[in-house]
């Protein structure tokens, strides 16, 4: 499973769902304009 809000990802971007970014070790939602 992939992670969404506040999911711990460390430095691994693959821990976050598509459309989410690993930021400060947690998954954050990213809006592509």
Curated annotation (Swiss-Prot):
Main function: Blocks transient outward voltage-gated potassium channels in rat ventricular myocytes (thus prolonging action-potential duration) and rat Kv4.2/KCNA4 channels expressed in Xenopus oocytes. Is also a weak blocker of calcium channels in rat cerebellar granule cells.
Major place of residence: secreted
Superkingdom of source: Eukaryota
Naturally occurring in which organism (per UniProt): Heteropoda venatoria (Brown huntsman spider)
Annotated family: Belongs to the neurotoxin 10 (Hwtx-1) family. 21 (HpTx1) subfamily.
Molecular function in Gene Ontology: calcium channel regulator activity; ion channel inhibitor activity; potassium channel regulator activity; toxin activity
InterPro entries: Huwentoxin-1 (IPR011696)
GO cellular component: extracellular region
Domain notes: The presence of a 'disulfide through disulfide knot' structurally defines this protein as a knottin.
Disulfide bond keyword on record: yes
Modified residues (Tryptophan amide): 33
Tissues where this protein is expressed: Expressed by the venom gland.
Subcellular location: Secreted
Name listed for the protein in its UniProt record: Kappa-sparatoxin-Hv1a
Signal peptide, first to last residue: none
Keywords of this entry: Amidation, Calcium channel impairing toxin, Disulfide bond, Ion channel impairing toxin, Knottin, Neurotoxin, Potassium channel impairing toxin, Secreted, Toxin, Voltage-gated potassium channel impairing toxin
Cysteine disulfide partners in this protein: 2-17, 9-22, 16-27
């Amino acid at each position: 499973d992939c992670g969404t809000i506040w999911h711990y990802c460390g430095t691994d971007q693959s821990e976050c769902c598509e459309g989410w970014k690993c930021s400060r070790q947690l998954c954050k939602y990213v809006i592509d304009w």
